[in-house]
Every structure is written in C-alpha cells, then in structure tokens.
Amino acid sequence: MINRHTRQLPAAPALPRWRRALVVTVVLAAFGVVLVACGEPDPPPPPPETTTTTTTVAPATCGAPEGSGPTAVAVMGPCPRLDADQIAFWFGLNTQVPYNATVPLATLVRLFLEEGRAEGVRGDIAFAQSIVETGWFSFPGRVPASANNFSGFGATDGTADYGVFPDARTGVRAQIQHLRRYADATATACTVPPLHNPCVDPRFAYVTPRGKAPTWNQFGNGNWATDPTYASKVLAVYTNMLGIARLSLA
C-alpha cells in the first residue's frame, strides 16, 4: 500500500557543465597548495667557499743556537730560551732592591725580547746584562733611571758622561743594536738594512772591528767594559735565570 502522506524529495538539479569545471579547478588548486605546503623543504644553500690562510708565528722560546755552550755563549740567536713570564717571575723571586725603571717590569722584559728578536740578538741574556749594569734596575750609580739607559751606555771610566734616551724602548733598542755590532760582522752600518729597526745607537760606529765578540765569554777587558770579570757576572745572572726552567747555560 502506498503511503499517500510520504512525499518524494525532488532530485538536486544538475550543475551546469561550466560550474562543475570551476569546482574541479578550485579543488585541484587547493589540493596543489596543500601538496606544496606539505612537501619536502628545499635543501639549504651550500656554505660559501672559504680560504684558509696559514700564518707562521715565531716560537716564544727556542733552544740555544748551534755551537753555543758554557764556554762560548752566543750573543746572536733567533729567539730567547726564556719567555717573558718566566723572566718576570724569576726577577720577582730574586730582586732585593727597589725597581726604579720608567716602565713596569713586565713591559721592560717584553721590550728586551721584542727588540732582541728583531735584530737576532738573544734578548733574555741582554736583560741579564742590564741587571748587572743597573743594579737590578735600582740605578744606584751615576746613570739615573730617567735616562732609560739600561747598559751603561756612554758611562765610560773616568768621565761623568752617560747616554740618555727618550723612552724605555729606545734605550733597549740602542743596547740591542750595540750588541749586534759587537757580535755580527754583517752589521756594517747603523742603517736599515742591515739593521731591522731604525738606528738609535749613537756609538754604533765606535765598535771596531765589527763582529769582534760573537760570544758573551769575550766581553770585558775592553769589549763593552773594562772589568775583566764582566762576562762572568753577566753569565752568572743568566745561569740563575735559566734555573727557573731547569735549563743549563748555553
């Protein structure tokens, strides 16, 4: 029996062909956006090419020069056997007098090592020489600390003269250049070259013949000083310094 009260819903009208095409296009476009959003991320760009530059740095310390030994301690050498920290530490343990130099001890040690390295002179032994010359930088003699004269420059026996330098570096440089003239026969003139820094040594030309004392053992008796025990005094201080690093004299 047919239920007369049941009404049949009318069928949905078919979309026109152009509307169906539009719906498909919108769905596909939306699906495409989802695919792009959910796909694999682009790989990161490659890192930029870099160039590695290797800089050769001279060592802070090195062994004694070839041929240098207790009876022939070389004045010249590419680098010191003790570094600045070792020298300053040793000095603090051993000095018993006021320090009166115009710059702090750490600065003065650095100047000796820098200037020595520039001219190929062993700056740690030059520092030991200055200890002998200045009484551990207390300057008890006629050369005052304000002269920045760490090596008795110009303070010859029988005169009241002495060398005066404008600052500590200049005083150290003059000492190093004078040592090179004593030890190195190639130091023909107080110019650049053969020197590596501008000449500040007013007595450079007075050392003749050049290169006449290549070892510290030859100092004294007219080489730098008239004292016949000058070399032994300098080397005794240096031997003591080397003890901080358990090194022997060479």
Task: Report the location of each language-model feature.
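Catalytic cores of secreted/periplasmic lytic hydrolases that degrade extracellular macromolecules
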Residues: 2, 26-27, 32, 39-49, ...
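Intrinsically disordered, low-complexity repeat segments enriched in small/polar residues
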Residues: 6-9, 53-58
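Intrinsically disordered, low-complexity segments enriched in proline/serine/threonine
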Residues: 12-18, 43-50
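N-terminal export and membrane-targeting signals
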Residues: 5-28
